[in-house]
Amino acid sequence: CAKDPIYFSEKYIQIVHVDHGLIPIKMYDYQKEICTAITENRRVTVNTSRQAGKTTTAVAVILHYIIFNDFKTVALLANKGDAAREILDRIKIAYEALPAWLQQGVIEWNKGSVEFENGCKIIAGSTSSSAIRGKSISFLYIDETAFVENWDEFFASVFPTISSGNTTKILFTSTPNGLNHFYKTCVGAQENKNGYIYIEVP
């Protein structure tokens, strides 16, 4: 379970379905590919179509990460803070639906952050905020990466906090938005030039 995020996700994680309420996750192959890629590698960039279940995948990956690690900080960012907090809300719902023996004790349970007794934290915010500046980040997840404005300035401010560790992880997921920073990251990954694993979800 600790070493297999796919088994953990399909066995224990539930998500809210519009018609059926809480339902177990049944992962598609590409979701399994993303889970495996970010578990086995440090940097993954996912070029995805809309409504492709990327948020569900992120919920599964992050929940597994904070349950089975100690003293890790996850930064969950999006170009809009509300979008990041919505993903955090989904993680909270999935966490509350876990069996009691899998849950960690909760220290902090706020709108924009959670902290557990194993020392793990999740911070949600916009890429334009100072939410994670100066913090030591173990896992950086950016949703809709292609739509982040002032990318160079933003990434220059956060990269030192994630490059200092030997096991830190970065996960980008986004729909395309022209030939910008996300496009360049994806191309670099495809050409094996930047250390990212590239996954495309048509």
Predicted regions: what is each one?
Residues 1-202:
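Phosphate/NTP-binding elements of NTP-utilizing enzymes
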